């Protein structure tokens, strides 16, 4: 399945919630018709079956983190093999992706932009260039922008935008140095309450 490159707002409208795919600090406002699905006339949303609700939740989380279907299924399998709550394990694996950590630290305005920074070799982990967006970051890893990439206007702009967002407690960032540390894996209480990971577990458990 190819990665979606169309209008980001369509994905948020499809899921009926702001997926934070745009770079602004403000949530999507009413003029974007978040309560109607994409289409010429904004078709009315049909009542979903239990399976439909579970599928939509999976699609929502997959789109938030920008992960393809096969990748997402593999993350679920890895989460199920770990000890503890499978749903929480899944979210921690997604949060530990390098592109997501770069986004959380504010080096990229969106996860898509952060993925591009990683792919273009603008990011280092513990002093080494890593260009794999799915690379799993471990607690105490140090993430920084490469010296030659620090002049990029988009990174400076992203840090300014990030300064207006609520800062994640599981990362520490020195904006002046464009460097940060992944202090720990986020706990469930740290993450969005708008995600119901149990629905995803129920979907894949069938």
Curated annotation (Swiss-Prot):
S4 RNA-binding domain ranges (all copies): 96-156
Keyword RNA-binding: yes
GO aspect biological process, one term: translation
InterPro entries associated with the record: Ribosomal_uS4, Ribosomal_uS4_bac-type, Ribosomal_uS4_CS, Ribosomal_uS4_N, S4_RNA-bd, S4_RNA-bd_sf
Record keyword rRNA-binding present: yes
Oligomer and partners: Part of the 30S ribosomal subunit. Contacts protein S5. The interaction surface between S4 and S5 is involved in control of translational fidelity.
Family indicated by similarity: Belongs to the universal ribosomal protein uS4 family.
Function: One of the primary rRNA binding proteins, it binds directly to 16S rRNA where it nucleates assembly of the body of the 30S subunit. With S5 and S12 plays an important role in translational accuracy.
Descriptive protein name: Small ribosomal subunit protein uS4
Gene: rpsD
